């Protein structure tokens, strides 16, 4: 069984505050941009299916992020874990049977 990242409400609030500051230019970095791009990509992919889920390949997520370092394919799933911990997506299953669902609109 895979252990999912679980954040307290306080940790979620702090992380969202950080992401909003990064969005507003108060903090320099690309972390927020990567999460946002991945969320938008997943939202588009999920909208194409009847059950509202998607299961993109890791390299597809990297391309959506604008990254060409395909040897770092784990990054897509790392960012998915972060989005899930913040309650923006839900992941079910594993491997080729994994399903990703959008659970709420992005607000950072």
Please state what every model-predicted region is.
Residues 84-94:
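A short, conserved structural fragment
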Residues 48-65:
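Short acidic, hydrophobic short linear motifs in intrinsically disordered regions
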Residues 3, 7-10, 14, 33, ...:
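Alpha-helix boundary/N-cap detector
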Residues 10-50:
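Short alpha-helical segments that sit at the start of domains
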Residues 94-108:
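Short, cationic-aromatic polyanion-contact patches
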Residues 69-85:
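Short amphipathic alpha-helical interaction segments
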Residues 1-10, 84, 105-108:
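Short intrinsically disordered terminal tails
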């Amino acid at each position: 069984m895979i252990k999912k990242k679980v954040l307290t409400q306080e940790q979620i609030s702090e992380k969202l505050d950080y992401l909003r500051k990064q969005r507003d230019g108060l903090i320099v970095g690309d972390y927020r941009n990567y999460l946002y791009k991945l969320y938008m990509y997943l939202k588009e992919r999920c909208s194409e299916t009847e059950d509202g889920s998607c299961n993109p390949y890791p390299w597809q997520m990297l391309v959506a992020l604008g990254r060409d370092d395909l040897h770092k394919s784990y990054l897509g799933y790392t960012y998915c874990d972060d989005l899930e911990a913040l309650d923006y997506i839900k992941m079910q299953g594993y491997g080729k049977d994994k399903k990703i669902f959008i659970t709420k609109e992005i607000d950072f």
